[in-house]
Amino acid sequence: MNPSTHVSSNGPTTPPHGPHTTFLPPTSPAPSTSSVAAATLCSPQRQAVSRYSGWSTEYTQWHSDLTTELLWHAHPRQVPMDEALAAAAAASYQVNPQHPANRYRHYEFQTLSLGTSEVDELLNCCAEETTCGGTQSTVLTNATNTTSCGGAVAGSSNVGPAGASAACDLDAELAGLETSAADFEQLRRLCAPLAIDTRCNLCAIISICLKQDCDQSWLLEYSLLCFKCSYAPRAALSTLIIMSEFTHLLQQHFSDLRIDDLFRHHVLTVFDFHLHFFINRCFEKQVGDAVDNENVTLNHLAVVRAMVMGEDTVPYNKPRRHPQQKQKNNPYHVEVPQELIDNFLEHSSPSRDRFVQLLFYMWAGTGVMSTTPLTELTHTKFARLDALSTASEREDARMMIEEEEDEEGGEKGGDDPGRHNGGGTSGGFSESTLKKNVGPIYLCPVPAFFTKNQTSTVCLLCELMACSYYDNVVLRELYRRVVSYCQNNVKMVDRIQLVLADLLRECTSPLGAAHEDVARCGLEAPTSPGGDSDYHGLSGVDGALARPDPVFCHVLRQAGVTGIYKHFFCDPQCAGNIRVTNEAVLFGRLHPHHVQEVKLAICHDNYYISRLPRRVWLCITLFKAFQITKRTYKGKVHLADFMRDFTQLLESCDIKLVDPTYVIDKYV
């Protein structure tokens, strides 16, 4: 028996150490609402028998209020400008739209929601930075511009009176600087969890819950969520599902806990979930040296923070190699808990749940779905986001009035951090404009939206891997058909184009020119031709049952040939997701009579190991950061050092990709 857990036939009798019990340093500051949460957890609501199997559309629905609120918190924001600054920026845009200070505004004019007035578009876009060091909604290229980050627009020129006037427009420059300062302050508060010496707020909440979890039922379900997280792709949809299901578990077992207040007070942010479930993996059993593990987390947090803040350089430090490390076995070889996985698969069946509707809802009206109108879904989402913004502004106003009344009554704010953060439920965030045309980009492992050469930092095929068991099987069949299309030495891009044409012809009911109905489809994965819902048969070698449905074909059209090529053969982030994703575990629905048994086995084994070590994910994140950061002399030196080590790392992990030195400058 694992010494860190004590499990009897009736369930775990003591909270296990390691992945579930958090030992907090006495000097760490407590979250501002932790004492309130502890007080309200005194009467947990218990369920007789829970059938929670994880990763289910029952808990994460696209039309739920919780989903919209989580998406609202994951959108980047921009401080609105006053009329004088907006007029100065507008004048600069009219004089020379091709000036680097205005080329990002030009893109956002094309991608803003339908029905938005020209003035609103200007207010949403006029404060973009002139370089890639600005806010993270900045898009690198538009439909006619594929220049690299920080470069001039193709075909543009600042020669002549118009160019000189735009280059010397001090009002526009001051407008950008003042707005950037406010944006920077918001981003700084948002990135508070991305510090190595800041306590994990999720661990603090889990510690409070464990004290109130008398029969350990919540612990078993949380363990199952962690187990499934180890076999999920790192994508925006995965982060949203984890946030939603974690919130659902808290609300189900502790009905008095107002989890929504934790988000509104910014005690919890989207980056708390990135840190806990993906970057540091607080539930994972510690392997190796503790200080080395801490440094991996430190470096990963620094890279993510740099991307969110839009810094011009990548915080890369060449790792030091000790002589004794060269004689060790491959440090990137991971032993998966095969016995535990076999036990899970024996007592589960693939679910027909599908998150495609949620995927469309997330990215409707954004650059990710640039060729897909989805007008009805876009209007629905934007209206809900606007309603949340209005409610947040009203709550902020109410809180400010209460604070003023308290101060007039002699109650001073003291060292209350909420007052210094702008007060109110949103920490001053509601005073800014939600960048709805960018989408919930903070959910992504690369929290910045860029496009380049018909690719973007949001890979739709990686998102599709988090949608359903069926989509993973069809993606695997697509890859098999591409690599085995013919015996001739045909380039992969040509193979993809030919296979894609065949797939679209084979589609059971092809979509027409209108794409509106696609958002209403895909709630469940299609059944086999005989009506059988057992999806183990989909993985047959002939692929007869793994036929794409119209929704799958629609996503392939949106990704395009280049996006498919990048996903299968070029991008290390996509390769990592393909390596770690196990759709049979992720979408496995436990049989009713074995739910408790399997949960006890997962909690007892205490084994939550990903197939790729955290150091590999750190290097993958560094690669993505170098892709979207402009090239300086110092950056080029760092990039050359990094690429040498990164190529060796891919070989050690047996990951075969197109030359990374080509990919890093070609795609994003």
UniProtKB/Swiss-Prot annotation:
Q: Quick one: which residues bind Zn(2+) 1?
A: 200, 203, 276, 282
Query: Which family would the database say this protein is a member of?
Result: Belongs to the herpesviridae UL32 protein family.
One GO CC term, this protein: host cell nucleus
Q: Where is this region: Zinc finger 1?
A: 200-282
Taxonomically, the superkingdom here is: Viruses
- Composition-biased stretches (Polar residues): 1-10
In terms of Pfam families, this protein maps to: Herpes_env
Q: Which PROSITE patterns match?
A: HERPESVIRUS_UL32
Record the organism.
Human cytomegalovirus (strain AD169) (HHV-5)
Name used for this protein in its record: Packaging protein UL32 homolog
Q: Where is the composition biased (Low complexity)?
A: 19-35
Q: Which regions are flagged for Basic and acidic residues bias? A: 410-419
- Does the record's keyword annotation contain Transferase? no
Zinc as a keyword? Answer: yes
Q: Where is this region: Disordered?
A: 1-35, 401-430
